[in-house]
Regions:
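Feature captures the catalytic ectodomains and active-site-proximal regions of enzymes
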Residues: 1-522
Length: 522
């Protein structure tokens, strides 16, 4: 066995443009700067197809990032995952689907679907909606309604009627005297419901009024609404179409009533989170929800694992096999993992392929530092000192051949949008990194430094000439650094992603990499 290895994951730290919104560059980080200037290093792709997401417009996140880091493979996430769960039927066996449909069957409640109506496959796919509608009819659900968001962004700009006609044909085939399957409301995706990054809560509120309260301009059908708006507003494209409510005799066909079941069928998270919060959270305060007391709500996927948005979802993340931990346990390698509460699940559960518990109790030790319960911008160092204390202590014990830690600061403070706090957060991470490097020298470790996705590196964004605070992840690559003065490692030329980290670790240890893994970088 070669030297033991310690891996530091700086959560939310990518390569920015060096401008005023790049908190990584703005911060005083002498240790990170020196490592990057003097050590073998490369930049890893940490978003989109490199982490199993459908397109390279999809930002990475901590969950898929740690999946890729910990398994050396690229697993389907998002659209592919939903498609597979519909094909195998596992979606309909999920506790959440059963709960929502039972609520309708036993309590006479309606089932509502909300989502983007197209086959763009970026946020949603109409085929997923149609499959669930057919299943609901097969199960005998009597009242099922669709609240449709028109696309024109991931598909041709004025293609809405193709999808509406397709959906109406399906709904007609499922309806009879006993069963009502109808479109109830809708509007353009850039006008209602699908805001992101908390940029425009009134847009979400307009969606709420339209779908839930049935308020708005009434039409006999979605087709009539679309054709009317196009005639009144020449040149208007689908994403900008105004809200509409389908009505009969002056009354909405269906409002979303308290106690109903609601499924948000978008699988991409960024534009699904705010409406999810409006349905899910008792303490919601971004707008007045009227007499709302609650529904049984589920998203297609978990849109944010850190913030638990939504509370319930239909499709579980993938169960990943042949993880790094499995390979190391087979080889008898002792492992140590540490973070604070905010990312503890990421260096354990997500790292181990979405599996709770340990692969081998006798070989793995985990440590969790309880996170602060105050807003992170108020204490941007978070628990970096305590994490470092535990990691250095574990290194000094010489018990472990592979240790990993996650500093959440760049991501969790990054999400607050408070630039000065993010700069302080980065400096705290660098202070921790300096101590880990010192321990690596003292106790004879190879030190690896990387991240799971960007965030702190892009705190500002400019749209239509206006610069505003950005709180979302970036699409920027993340560093991968090897610090080991005793071994002159060379990183091979190539385009690498997060899934190349595990094979590199195994290669350094002189172990065999599984055939299904990505290649090592050395």
């Amino acid at each position: 066995m070669k030297k033991p290895i310690v891996l530091v994951i700086m959560d939310g730290v990518g390569r920015g443009d060096g401008g005023p919104g790049d908190a990584v560059k703005q911060a005083n980080t002498p240790t990170l700067d020196k490592l990057m200037a003097t050590c073998p290093m490369t930049w890893l792709k940490a978003h989109g197809t490199a982490v199993g997401l459908p397109t390279d417009d999809d930002m990475g996140n901590s969950e898929v990032g740690h999946n890729a880091l910990g398994c050396g493979q690229i697993y389907s996430q998002g659209a592919k995952l939903v498609q597979e769960s519909i094909e195998t039927g596992s979606l309909y066996q999920s506790k959440t689907w059963v709960e929502l449909t039972d609520n309708c069957l036993q309590n006479g409640k309606a089932l509502h679907f909300i989502g983007l109506l197209s086959d763009g496959n970026v946020h949603s796919n109409i085929s997923h909606l149609i499959a669930m509608l057919k299943k609901a009819r097969e199960m005998g659900l009597k009242k099922v309604y669709c609240h449709i968001l028109l696309d024109g962004r991931d598909v041709p700009a004025t293609s809405a009627l193709e999808y509406v006609d397709q959906l109406e044909a399906v709904l007609a085939s499922l309806s009879d005297a006993e069963h009502e399957y109808k479109i109830a409301s809708g509007g353009g995706r850039m006008v209602i419901t699908m805001d992101r990054y908390e940029a425009n809560w009134p847009m979400v509120e307009m969606g709420w009024r339209t779908h839930v309260q049935g308020e708005g301009r009434q039409f006999a059908s979605a087709k009539e609404a679309i054709e009317t708006y196009r005639a009144e507003n020449p040149g208007m494209i689908d994403q900008d179409l105004l809200p509409f409510v389908i009505a009969k005799d002056g009354q909405p066909v269906a409002k979303i009533a308290n106690g109903d079941s609601v499924i948000l069928f978008n699988f991409r998270g960024d534009r699904a989170q705010e409406i999810s919060l409006a349905f899910d959270r008792k303490d919601f305060d971004h707008f007045d929800r009227g007499d709302y007391t609650g529904v049984k709500f589920a998203g297609m996927l978990e849109y944010d694992g850190d913030l638990k948005i939504p509370m319930h979802y239909l499709v579980e993340p993938p169960v990943i096999r042949n993880t790094l931990t499995e390979v190391l346990c087979k080889a008898g390698v002792h492992e140590y993992a540490v973070s604070e509460t905010q990312k503890y699940g990421h260096v354990t559960y997500f790292w181990n392929g979405n599996r709770s518990g340990k692969v081998d109790e006798s070989l793995e030790d985990y440590a969790e530092v309880p996170s602060d319960v105050i807003p992170f911008e108020q204490a941007p160092a978070m628990k970096s000192v305590e994490i470092t204390d535990l990691l250095v202590e574990a290194m000094a014990s010489h018990k472990y051949q592979f240790l990993r830690c996650n500093y959440p600061n760049g991501d969790m403070v990054g999400h607050t949008g408070v630039l000065s706090a993010v700069i302080t957060a980065m400096e705290a991470v660098d202070t921790g990194l300096a101590r880990v490097k010192e321990a690596a020298d003292k106790y004879g470790y190879t030190l690896l430094v990387t991240a799971d996705h960007g965030n702190a590196d892009q705190m500002l964004e400019t749209k239509k000439g206006k610069t505003s605070v950005r709180t979302a992840h970036s699409l920027n690559p993340v560093p991968f650094i090897i610090y080991d003065p005793d071994n002159k490692y060379e990183i091979k030329d190539g385009h690498y992603g997060l899934a190349n980290v595990a094979p590199t670790i195994v290669t350094m240890m002189g172990l065999e990499t599984p055939d299904c893994w990505q290649p090592s970088m050395i």
